[in-house]
Amino acid sequence: ESDMKRTTHIGLLLAALCLAHPAHSGGQREEAMSANVRSSLQRALADTAVTRTAFRNTADEAAWLKEMSRRLAKRMPDESERMEFLTTLHWEASRAGVDPQLMLGLIQVESGFRKYAVSPVGARGYTQVMPFWVKAIGNADHNPFQLRTNLRYGALILRHYIDIERGDLYRAL
């Protein structure tokens, strides 16, 4: 339970930090990527389908899913869709080493939890994946409107930027 409270506090702190500063989205742009980075990101995309969250403790998993489901109920009225979204988000964020609460905040800002959101510059889906990422690390079969694909790309891209910015979340976001 203390892990759940700590995770919730971290998520709220990060959300407050993001809201305290005006958004300065510099926009993603295609940049040269080393073969090693490209290969690493491609391998990360090639994993198996999500079947559960990354929690090791089922009580923590149930508590997190219940609380996050309650918070998202107005934005995602269909409970089965909401649970699939949360399960996939938790797995993909954890897999990429990104706090799931941070991913939820990113999605709220980027797409308002709209699966088919498209930005004026062509970013797509929940995490607003830019088309050049699919070309750079994916393949033509990857659909950024597909839930698992979008959350996986979003988590990996966020992890990539966090690494580039040496853990500075403000700059990475």
What do these predicted ranges mean?
Residues T48-L173:
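Catalytic glycan-binding domains that act on GlcNAc-containing polysaccharides
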